[in-house]
């Protein structure tokens, strides 16, 4: 093989290795940043296709904060609360300042890591804007298995239970 062909072959191989490494790193980064969305029922019972998250997996969970479940640590910013749709409840532990719209009975989406089968250590908690708004993922997941809630005018105004 003459020197010109060797040089060309080396250049092609280097280009192939570089492109392969770039694609591999991009796929790895995308996989690390992917958070799957679950409802509390799907987290406990599994999704319809049978998949269940593993302990240590990053995920997002959406549902309603269960009334009477919010427990605040008096020595830190840590808060634990339960989230449910119409099925099982899942405990969310969050160490930080909660959004102003966070309250019991309110819809939330928490992003974090699954600590055990029914506990999530969240690093972000988002509250929905009003009683009518629901994050698209939560609405879609709840629409599949649940009937929509019918609010009275008092409940919409925030004066009734």
From Swiss-Prot:
Keywords: Cell inner membrane, Cell membrane, Cytochrome c-type biogenesis, Heme, Iron, Membrane, Metal-binding, Signal-anchor, Transmembrane, Transmembrane helix
Residue intervals on the Periplasmic side: 30-161
Any single GO BP term: cytochrome complex assembly
Cytoplasmic side: 1-8
Coiled coil, from the record: none
Subcellular location: Cell inner membrane
Gene3D superfamilies reported for this sequence: Nucleic acid-binding proteins
Renumbered residue ranges of the record's region Disordered: 142-161
Pfam families, alphabetized: CcmE (PF03100)
Gene Ontology cellular-component terms listed: plasma membrane
Composition bias, Polar residues: 151-161
Bilayer topology term: Single-pass type II membrane protein
GO terms, molecular function: heme binding; metal ion binding
Matches recorded under NCBIfam families: PRK13165.1 (NF009638), PRK13254.1-1 (NF009727), PRK13254.1-3 (NF009729), PRK13254.1-5 (NF009731)
Function: Heme chaperone required for the biogenesis of c-type cytochromes. Transiently binds heme delivered by CcmC and transfers the heme to apo-cytochromes in a process facilitated by CcmF and CcmH.
Listed name of the protein: Cytochrome c-type biogenesis protein CcmE
Source species: Aliivibrio fischeri (strain MJ11)
